[in-house]
């Protein structure tokens, strides 16, 4: 909608704190008031801080027209995929399919698919300890082939 409207209307819409807040609320799974305030404050501080309307619209178009799965065959290092069980931007089935695309290429021993339960897209806010623990375990493995 921000792209379809004239710039005088579309630009403020893209920077809208109301839209940022609604999006933030829809993506959160936590019920902890302090965490909800923190996430909302982070989104309010950073979501409207893009350089140009054109740039944010280009980024959006790229985000809906390509996926990381397209680049899987080119990845030549072990991969750990952290997936939110209840992510609004992707399903566990889609994530498993993306991970399966990685398994047939060289350097796949030791790779991990990790599902973090009861969390949405905001793993880094809502379950940072669980995510960091999984990453720490993964990075300390011996990946000698």
Predicted features and spans:
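Flexible "cap/lid" loop of the alpha/beta hydrolase fold
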Residues: 1-8
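Conserved alpha/beta-hydrolase catalytic His-Asp/Glu region
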Residues: 12-74
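Conserved alpha/beta-hydrolase "acid-adjacent" motif
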Residues: 35, 88-94
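Residue-level signal for the nucleotide or nucleotide-sugar donor/cofactor binding architecture
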Residues: 51, 90, 126
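Short, conserved loop/helix-junction motifs that constitute active-site signature segments
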Residues: 72-76, 101-108
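Short beta-strand/loop motif that positions the catalytic acidic residue
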Residues: 75, 81-83, 87
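Catalytic active-site module of serine/aspartate enzymes centered on a nucleophile-bearing elbow/loop
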Residues: 103-145
């Amino acid at each position: 909608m921000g792209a379809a409207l004239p710039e005088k209307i579309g630009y403020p819409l893209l920077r809208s704190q109301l839209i940022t807040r609604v999006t933030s609320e829809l993506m959160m799974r936590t019920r902890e008031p302090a965490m909800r305030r923190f996430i909302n404050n982070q989104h309010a501080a950073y979501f409207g801080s893009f350089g140009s309307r054109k740039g944010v619209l280009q980024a959006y178009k790229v985000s809906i027209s390509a996926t990381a799965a397209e680049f899987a065959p080119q990845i030549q290092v072990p991969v750990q995929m952290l997936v939110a069980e209840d992510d609004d931007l992707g399903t566990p089935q889609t994530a498993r399919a993306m991970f399966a695309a990685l398994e047939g290429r060289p350097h796949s021993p030791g790779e991990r698919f990790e599902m973090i339960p009861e969390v949405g897209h905001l793993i880094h806010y809502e379950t940072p300890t669980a995510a960091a623990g999984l990453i720490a375990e993964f990075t300390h493995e011996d990946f000698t082939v």
